[in-house]
């Protein structure tokens, strides 16, 4: 251990959470959810990867932890794991996460129609991470023998000044989400069960310490989703879903995509005439679905793939000279090149999915499920690696 600073591994976390529901009226509920998490982590500055690597590669008997007079031991090309753990400084990371949601739910059963509700919700999440790395490169030695008086003689391995350096990093995110939905669920004549939902959502994610000018732009998306279901005596099932989603990653005219899906099911084991065999086969259901989903995260680390990016510091061809203070008095000027070619026609990557399946329950104890599915993807965005001749 080092008496100048604390490099020991430690982790502390503090949590706070509260959920409050307030009945504003008999049919109106205001909900507030707030949670906070604060963590502090301390560790050696060298990092776990370096420590484990050197521990596995160094011969245990090559050098001691320290020499008897307290001198730090090491050998050329292979740092002493003891020094990495105790003598290279420390890293301290503190982070906090705050999450909050406010919602308002209204039940319209008494004055519009039974089973109709609406809900709006707003949430704000914030994260902050601050890291302090205080590193030091100590002087290390290797014993090469003893003098006539029995004192250890050393050769210098690392002749560093031993000063502590400071390196800091900061990161954080801000996430805003708004949702508004209308829901309807009702059963008629003990046989017909219907439900419907329409949901609008809008999201925005921003970084407090963006690493590039592209990352400084908030990540935004919005969309509308809808679902309708129907079942008859819990035997016949039908469901329709759709999403109409918008993404910032595409050019105007291509930002929104429509993705529908439909599913049907038949619970044959709920038929009255199935009762004689229900002790053996208690569940038998056939189901099928067909629909599409979209993916807008198609550019990897690249955003706004519809825009062409320009490099103003291209090397290679010289396009002129300008005066400078060198001996020649001039320096060449590079040109402008295209870094990434934009594609204004790029749009949602779409996956068309189809599925048929069966669910089987035996003896009220064993359930078997089998599915056959097909997934076909279209509109996959690829970067051309070479230009055809």
Say what each PLM segment does.
Residues 67-69:
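Amphipathic helix-loop-helix modules that constitute alpha-helical solenoid scaffolds
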Residues 1-10:
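Surface-exposed beta-strand-turn/loop segments characteristic
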Residues 19-38, 42-48, 53-57, 73-135, ...:
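Extracellular/periplasmic, surface-exposed regions of secreted and cell-surface proteins
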Residues 10-14, 256-259:
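Short, conserved loop/turn and helix-capping segments at secondary-structure boundaries
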Residues 62:
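Conserved functional hotspot residues at active sites or interaction interfaces
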Residues 140:
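Active-site-proximal polar cores
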């Amino acid at each position: 251990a080092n008496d100048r600073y604390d490099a020991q591994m430690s982790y502390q976390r503090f949590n706070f959470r509260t959920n409050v529901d307030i009945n504003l009226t008999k049919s109106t509920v205001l909900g507030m959810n707030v949670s906070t998490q604060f963590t502090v982590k301390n560790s050696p500055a060298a990092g776990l990867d370096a420590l484990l690597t050197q521990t596995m590669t160094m011969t245990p008997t090559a050098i001691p932890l320290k020499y008897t007079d307290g001198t730090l031991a090491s050998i050329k090309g292979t740092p002493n794991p003891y020094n990495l753990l105790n003598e290279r400084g420390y890293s301290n990371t503190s982070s906090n996460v705050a999450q909050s949601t406010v919602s308002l739910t209204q039940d319209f059963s008494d004055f519009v129609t039974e089973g109709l509700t609406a809900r709006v919700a707003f949430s704000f999440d914030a994260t902050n991470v601050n890291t302090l790395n205080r590193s030091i490169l100590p002087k290390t030695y290797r014993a090469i023998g003893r003098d006539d008086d029995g004192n250890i003689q050393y050769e210098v391995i690392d002749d560093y000044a031993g000063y502590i350096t400071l390196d800091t990093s900061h990161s954080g995110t801000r996430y805003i989400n708004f949702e508004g939905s209308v829901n309807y669920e009702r059963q008629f004549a003990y046989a017909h069960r219907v439900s419907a939902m329409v949901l609008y959502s809008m999201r925005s994610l921003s970084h407090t310490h963006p690493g590039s000018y592209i990352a400084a732009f908030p990540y935004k998306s919005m969309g509308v989703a809808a679902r309708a279901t129907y079942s008859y005596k819990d035997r016949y099932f039908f469901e329709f879903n759709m999403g109409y989603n918008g993404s910032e990653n595409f050019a105007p005219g291509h930002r929104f995509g429509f993705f529908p899906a439909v599913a049907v099911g038949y619970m044959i084991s709920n038929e009255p005439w199935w009762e004689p065999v229900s002790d053996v086969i208690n569940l038998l259901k056939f189901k099928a679905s067909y629909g599409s989903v979209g993916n807008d995260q198609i550019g990897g680390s690249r955003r706004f793939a519809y825009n062409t990016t320009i490099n103003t510091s291209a090397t290679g061809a010289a396009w002129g000279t300008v005066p400078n203070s060198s001996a020649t008095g001039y320096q060449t000027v590079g040109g402008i090149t295209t870094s990434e070619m934009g594609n204004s026609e790029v749009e949602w990557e779409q996956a068309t999915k189809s599925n048929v399946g069966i669910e089987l329950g035996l003896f009220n104890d064993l359930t078997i499920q089998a599915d056959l599915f097909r997934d076909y993807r279209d509109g996959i965005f690829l970067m051309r690696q070479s230009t055809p001749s």
